[in-house]
């Protein structure tokens, strides 16, 4: 009898182990394919930081190099131009790359360039509507934003804040688009139903550089010239709320951008705010659950960071240095390298998720907050 009990116990254990293995295999099989698309040259036109093209990494497999997709964006001399922005749509399954002169549209299912158009005034860092129908494309540090049809690339409207057009963020609900110029202390808010400037936030203490917003579009967090840190604005009232300086570090000369902090991002759950520090080659992390946010810790990275964004689920932080950081532990888990083993660094990258060869979800080149309701559930740009 005792031998029978032992036999059945072993049989049950083996069955449980098998079921666990099957469940694990099933979970892996049903997990979306997560790819990180990195547009290069994404630090000025420096080819030593990743060459030219769309460099793809497997987020589910240690961020290993997958492939390089050829892109356009060549100048009259045949050399690659500075990439200024990247965005993608799960609905249309298209990815867009802006350079200082042109806007490119790539079909991600065929990995072919559908069109490339030179927009009047050039291009800077754009943003795409949640349904992929429209892009707000800033001219290259000039007066206006071109509103572009996502299908054809045709300009359908223009907004002219005359602010030195530079950075653009679409709200998650698609109703508002946020326009920042590098020669203005005001953040312009566009009504996307009419493609007109509706109101502003600020003035902030100096011209706005990279910025971000929370999911409910009640707060903006802006970096500005001459500040190692950031300021906070109330999108509802239009007023500046707080000025927050990084402590324990001193600003100094930087190789690019001309400002101490050129990069800021909210984690998708909006619990943390990450700010770049070029001179000291650090990321500074703040507790965003309190106002004003309070400084928590800092992370040393391998080069001067000029941007920061996050994976859709908030698992990874992606500074422009190519360091891949586990956002929870604050540890660098790997670095991006291309097919030759060379380091890849870029300020222009976006996550795209696939299921059954179809795009189901896209991230954002900006580290935007994704909490839409009091339940604290983040949202991504998901195909219908």
Predicted regions and their residues:
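Bacterial N-terminal signal peptides
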Residues: 6-18
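Predominantly soluble domains enriched in secretory-pathway, periplasmic, or organellar proteins
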Residues: 14, 23-384
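Positively charged n-region of N-terminal signal peptides that target proteins for export
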Residues: 1-4
């Amino acid at each position: 009898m005792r031998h029978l009990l032992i036999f059945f116990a072993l049989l049950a254990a083996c069955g449980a182990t098998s079921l666990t293995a099957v469940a694990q295999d099933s979970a892996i099989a049903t997990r979306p394919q997560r790819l990180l698309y990195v547009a290069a040259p994404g630090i000025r036109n420096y080819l030593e930081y990743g060459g030219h093209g769309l460099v793809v990494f497997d987020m589910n497999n240690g961020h290993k190099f997958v492939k390089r997709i050829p892109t356009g964006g060549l100048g009259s001399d045949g050399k690659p131009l500075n990439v200024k922005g990247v965005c993608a749509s799960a609905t249309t399954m298209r990815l867009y790359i802006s350079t200082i002169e042109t806007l490119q549209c790539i079909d991600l299912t065929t990995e072919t360039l559908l069109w490339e158009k030179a927009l009047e005034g050039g291009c800077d860092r754009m943003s795409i509507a949640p349904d992929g129908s429209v892009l707000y494309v800033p001219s290259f540090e000039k007066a206006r934003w071109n509103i572009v049809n996502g299908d054809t690339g045709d300009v359908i409207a223009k907004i002219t804040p005359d602010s030195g057009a530079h950075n653009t963020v679409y709200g998650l609900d698609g109703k508002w688009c946020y326009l920042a110029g590098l020669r203005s202390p005001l953040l312009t808010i566009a009504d996307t139903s009419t493609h007109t400037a509706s109101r502003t936030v600020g003035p902030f203490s100096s011209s706005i550089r990279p910025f971000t917003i929370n999911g409910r579009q009640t707060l903006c967090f802006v970096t500005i010239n001459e500040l190692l840190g950031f300021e906070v604005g109330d999108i509802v009232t239009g007023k500046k709320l707080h000025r927050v300086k990084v402590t324990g570090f001193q600003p100094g000369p930087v190789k690019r951008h001309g400002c101490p902090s050129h990069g800021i991002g909210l984690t998708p759950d909006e619990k943390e705010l990450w700010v770049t520090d070029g001179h000291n080659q650090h990321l500074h992390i703040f507790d965003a659950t309190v106002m004003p946010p309070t400084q928590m810790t800092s992370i040393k990275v391998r080069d001067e960071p000029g941007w920061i964004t996050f994976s859709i689920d908030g698992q990874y932080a992606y500074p422009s240095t190519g360091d891949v950081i586990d956002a929870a532990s604050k540890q660098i888990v790997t670095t991006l390298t291309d097919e030759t083993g060379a380091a890849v660094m870029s300020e222009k990258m976006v996550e795209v998720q696939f299921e059954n060869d179809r795009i189901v979800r896209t991230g954002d080149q900006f580290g935007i907050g994704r909490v839409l309701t009091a339940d604290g559930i983040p949202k991504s740009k998901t195909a219908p």
